[in-house]
Amino acid sequence: SEVWISSVQPYNAYGYQFGWEQMQQMQDMGLFLRGVKTKLKDNGDDYYGIIRESTSRSIPSAIIEHCHVDESRDTPYCQTEEDWKKFGREDALSVAKYFGLSSASLGVDYSGEADALPEVSLQSILPATVRDKTEPDICQLTLQNADYETGEVSLEVTAADYDCPMMYYDYSTDGGRTYSELLPWPGLDIMAGTYPDTFTFSVTFTKGEQPVITVRGYNQADLFTESDPEIG
């Protein structure tokens, strides 16, 4: 899940606060969060027309991408009409919480929710919403253990991006010719902007095989840096 917002203040700040609330609802559903972001054209204007034109009319706006239908981890959330309706209800709940609405007839009171929104500045674009244009600064792979009886290799990944969070990783066992599916970065908290810069994972191989393993670390902008290979 991700939310696209305007790069223009104060709509950038309004959008970030709404997107933050929306991300809480999507997280509660179990979806993987990709954050609240801006996307710009080459001339610096907002890329998406609905956002650009809304801002020009002084109307706050946001585009919500609930999930990707071609992503295997997302498809369980968007298969039926009831799934789609649930997204709509969660969107409405995000709006109600953002504005701090209450209803005696419905028995709900979100008047305190608005006070829990993250603090923002109306003077400049929020750094967390700026799309990074460079690859991660570091991506290193270290062989921890190779058990040739069981065919299991344990590896340590160390990676960092000094401009935005790490988002995914994938790995290759054939020296980079083919790669696994993208895997979520372990321990990532995209809304806090935090992630562990080191984690371990294991791969299995056929007995007698000597894999050549590489890892790619991806940042929030989907740009990657590839590690040097390790021979298992």
Could you describe each region identified by the protein language model?
Residues 15-44:
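Active-site-adjacent substrate-binding region
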Residues 35-46, 114-115, 122-131, 184-195:
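Surface-exposed intrinsically disordered loops and tails
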Residues 32-36, 104, 226:
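Acidic/polar loop patches that form or flank catalytic/metal-binding clefts of enzymes
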Residues 101-153:
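Short, compositionally biased P/S/T/A/G/V-rich stretches that sit at domain boundaries
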Residues 1-21:
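A short, glycine/acidic-enriched catalytic loop
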Residues 37-114, 126:
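Active-site-adjacent mobile loop/cap segments within catalytic or ligand-binding domains
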Residues 134-137, 141-232:
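Long, low-complexity serine/threonine/glycine- and acidic-rich segments characteristic of extracellular
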Residues 8, 23-32, 83, 92-100:
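Sec-exported extracytoplasmic/periplasmic mature domains
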